[in-house]
Regions:
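Terminus-proximal functional modules
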Residues: 1-67
Length: 67
């Protein structure tokens, strides 16, 4: 899991901006996240996978953070 500091940076980023580069805790996935209508969608940069989250907490718990 990411540090509390990085998790807080991720939360703060999306309070100010609707779009951001993302990295996964495994180090194997990178993507771009867009926040619309309070939901978070991450498009994987390596393939066509898309990950959707209802909350920021769910996104963080799944191992994603701002890059």
């Amino acid at each position: 899991m990411w540090t509390e500091n990085l998790q807080q940076q991720t939360k703060e980023h999306f309070k100010q901006y609707p779009l951001g580069p993302m990295k996964h805790f495994t180090g194997k996935k990178y993507g771009v996240c867009i926040c619309e209508d309070g939901k978070y969608t991450i498009a994987n940069r390596s393939n066509d996978e898309v990950y959707e989250y209802e909350t920021m907490e769910a996104l963080l718990e799944d191992g994603w953070a701002i890059d």
